[in-house]
Amino acid sequence: MKILFFGPNGSGKGTQGAIVKEKFGIPHIETGVIFRDNISRGTDLGKQAKDYIDQGGLVPDSITIPMILDRLKEDDCKSGWLLDGFPRNLVQAQELGKALEKEGINVDIVIEILLDREIAKNRIMGRRLCVNDNNHPNNIYIDAIKPDGDKCRVCGGELKTRSDDQDEEAIDQRHNIYYDTENGTMAGVIFFKEISAKNNGIPKIIGLDGRPGVKEVSEELMSKLRGTSLNNPIT
């Protein structure tokens, strides 16, 4: 089961990716982790990426995509993988598609969490961190995990915010890239949808309503994955 996973910041994409990883026993691959791993191991690609990062630049696709391909060829990816956070735009989607095809790697499923931009932004700005345990979920805009006043809903501890969660300009910039249907991330999603339409539904496109809570979204996702011939959960 080889999956590309899309969703805007604030959609819970990372949480759902972790659930898929646990359920199906496939690695949840994120580009940031790939960069850090290559840099820490001192690979040729890692050294090249570090030069760009140290200068405050973006790592070019000519480095990022080979890193991703190397990761997808590792032993733990033989039974499948979930790629999260790439591609981020149409050009990357096109280049990744070409590279995967050249390597004989097929994408089986494209998952897209659908969420209105305003809701996604509110969810980011509504996040609250418990000083006792960051894993205690609190969000002033999500009823299921709304804090108890100004206290943690789980333990009653004090709550704080992350500065980047309150940076509206940064949030808007990320969302500008994601919601751009001409050149941005959503344009990349459309690219893979067009491939699916021309290729008898391969890759399979799964759209998820991101408005409900984590449990409901996960149940919808598992239900749709069970409808594929690639479903092989470990539990």
Report residues per predicted region.
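Glycine-rich phosphate-binding loop of ATP-dependent small-molecule kinases
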Residues: M1-T235
